[in-house]
């Protein structure tokens, strides 16, 4: 399953993401990973979340993030939930690349029985129909 939290800057996406992560950790039977750009969420999330700073691993486009996520899953089959905060800061603000990545996540999640939640700084009205199906 995949959820996309989309809104313009300052619309409360990160607060929704933090609440979702902490709720998931309280109820999940597997590992939870949060990938962010920078180290802003360190004190907002419970210690049981594996927090990853994408800058530390040189992740700056969708191919690197796909490889990183694939490697995480290959190394730990207990990961049930992956959160990505501020997708466009991590992979760049190309809307087509962002859409392609979201669709890849949907397929990867279904194949590997995982859940993805991504926050995207963009206007939800501008999202394609394929992406609108995942908006929360």
Task: Mark where each language-model region is.
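Conserved P-loop
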Residues: 1-71, 127-129
């Amino acid at each position: 399953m995949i959820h996309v939290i989309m809104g313009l800057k300052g619309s409360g996406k990160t607060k929704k993401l933090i609440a979702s992560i902490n709720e998931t950790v309280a109820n999940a039977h597997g590992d939870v990973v949060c990938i962010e750009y920078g180290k802003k969420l360190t004190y907002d999330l419970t210690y049981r979340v594996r927090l990853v700073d994408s800058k530390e691993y040189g992740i700056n486009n969708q191919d690197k993030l796909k490889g990183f996520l694939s490697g995480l899953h290959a190394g730990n089959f207990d990961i049930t939930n992956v959160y990505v905060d501020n997708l466009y800061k991590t992979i760049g603000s190309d809307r087509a690349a962002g859409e392609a990545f979201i669709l890849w996540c949907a397929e990867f999640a279904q194949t590997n029985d995982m859940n993805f939640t991504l926050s995207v700084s963009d206007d939800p009205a501008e999202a394609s129909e394929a992406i609108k199906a995942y908006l929360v």
